[in-house]
Amino acid sequence: TLKIPSLNVNVKVYEGTGSSVLAKGAGHFEDTSIWDGNCAIAGHNRGANCYFGDIHNLNVGDTITLTTRLGTRTYSVTSVNKISETDNSLLAPTAENCVTLFTCVRNQSAYRWAVRAVEV
């Protein structure tokens, strides 16, 4: 479960990022860690399950909480960036524990919002 208190987001995270997964909630990028290092998660920005519609409004220092079968961790937002849809650099493994959130940029299909938060 992913919680973003400043945006009133409380969403279950499923494995995978296909359209059927994102129709239910947020989706974990299967090639990234679910716990140690970089855990990358995608979500829709509009429609019935638009849990990530406002992530571009997050501020540095806002908190994100991720609960998995391994426990609960709290993260602090360190960056919010608009990136190219082909930029996969934020999916790379990291030494520090972090969560990276992705969603589409409304009406700009070539771009994505990417939010990085590190464990506190």
Briefly describe each language-model feature range.
Residues 1-120:
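Solvent-exposed, non-transmembrane regions of membrane-associated and secreted proteins
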